[in-house]
């Protein structure tokens, strides 16, 4: 069995083994989650050599970034997930209309606010 570490669904976080699974939701979609797993079960199912291939992390961290996402940061697994869409140039008349309705005369401030949320998700912003 020649599994690459990225293909192995198991992770070791600190001293715990976790399995990455797709959890089914009632709406028919799935979300990825981590569930605890037993190391002895892994040995029985795959052999002791398999355990050496499991990716190891010291713990979890949460570092949001939409432009420079990193799954691993200094030996820690980032719990923040990348967003599935990326901005593209072009016209957006319907979104512009909704934002104009929400922000009114201050729509330019709304554009700046949304841009900051995307580019600098760690920056503290006022509640609008």
Predicted regions and their residues:
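Intein modules and their embedded homing endonuclease domains
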Residues: 1-86, 121
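P-loop NTPase catalytic core of nucleic-acid-dependent motor ATPases
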Residues: 67-128
């Amino acid at each position: 069995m020649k599994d690459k570490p990225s293909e192995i669904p198991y992770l070791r976080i600190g001293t715990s083994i976790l399995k990455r699974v797709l959890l089914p939701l009632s709406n028919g979609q799935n979300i990825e989650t981590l569930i605890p797993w037993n190391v002895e079960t892994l040995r029985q199912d795959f052999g002791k050599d398999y355990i050496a291939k499991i990716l190891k992390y010291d713990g979890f961290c949460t570092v949001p970034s939409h432009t420079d996402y990193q799954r691993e940061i200094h030996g820690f697994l980032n719990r923040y997930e990348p967003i599935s869409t990326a901005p593209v140039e072009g016209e957006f008349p319907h979104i512009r209309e909704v934002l104009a309705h929400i922000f009114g005369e201050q729509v330019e401030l709304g554009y700046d606010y949304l841009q900051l949320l995307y580019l600098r998700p760690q920056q503290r912003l006022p509640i609008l």
